[in-house]
């Protein structure tokens, strides 16, 4: 992984190749995926300093070309900042990546008091699943759920046993 020193000079460690990580939060592995930096936009969710964060600023070093991301932790609302991973898979080829979370998809069963009741991919029921308080997601969920047109699904990010719905979609009849 790279870093910036106090004089704003970028440094890259030799073993900065992108890698999948596993955590020990709930006994199941919390996995990450590598995302090429040219695909990352403001508002995307990345893993910064080991925490799921929503990107609020992207900068690029003029000297090294390395990307730097500032994000807000989805669960604690703290700021985290990290530089992109740089790897050289072949001579004169430079690839910059960041780690992103693996999202889960749950089916919404009920909505109550600012949280949802949802069914996981394995059929377990999750009570009181919080919804991210941005991008009017709660209003969009309510509208889709009350319309009754298709099955409402939420994309969920988890961190050390805690989960939060961060986006939604409606799956219509033939794809249930």
From Swiss-Prot:
GO BP term (any one): positive regulation of translational termination
GO cellular component: cell septum; Woronin body
Alphabetized SUPFAM superfamilies for the sequence: Nucleic acid-binding proteins (SSF50249), Translation proteins SH3-like domain (SSF50104)
UniProt superkingdom: Eukaryota
Effect of residue 39 to G: Abolishes the ability to self-assemble
Region Disordered: start-end pairs: 1-31
Pfam families, A to Z: eIF-5a (PF01287), IF5A-like_N (PF21485)
Propeptide position ranges: 1-16
Annotated function: Major component of Woronin bodies, fungal-specific organelles that occlude septal pores in order to separate intact from damaged compartments. Hex-1 binds directly or indirectly to the Woronin body tether that in turn is anchored at the rim of the septal pore.
Quaternary state and interactors: Forms oligomers. Self-assembles into hexagonal rods.
Full protein name: Woronin body major protein
Source organism per UniProt: Neurospora crassa (strain ATCC 24698 / 74-OR23-1A / CBS 708.71 / DSM 1257 / FGSC 987)
Gene that this polypeptide is encoded by: hex-1
């Amino acid at each position: 992984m790279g870093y910036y020193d106090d004089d704003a000079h970028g440094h890259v460690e030799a073993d900065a190749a992108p890698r999948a990580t596993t955590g020990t939060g709930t006994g199941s592995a919390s996995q990450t995926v590598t995302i090429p930096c040219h695909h990352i936009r403001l508002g995307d969710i990345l893993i910064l300093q080991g925490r799921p964060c929503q990107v609020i600023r992207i900068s690029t070093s003029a000297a090294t070309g390395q990307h730097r991301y500032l994000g807000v932790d989805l669960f604690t609302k703290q700021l985290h900042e990290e530089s992109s991973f740089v790897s050289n898979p072949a001579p004169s080829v430079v690839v910059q990546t960041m780690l992103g979370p693996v999202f889960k998809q749950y089916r919404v069963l009920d909505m109550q008091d600012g949280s949802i009741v949802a069914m996981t991919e394995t059929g377990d029921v999750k009570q009181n699943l919080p919804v991210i308080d941005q991008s009017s997601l709660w209003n969009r969920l309510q509208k889709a759920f009350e319309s009754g047109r298709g099955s409402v699904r939420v994309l969920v990010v988890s961190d050390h046993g805690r989960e939060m719905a961060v986006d939604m979609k409606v799956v219509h009849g033939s794809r249930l």
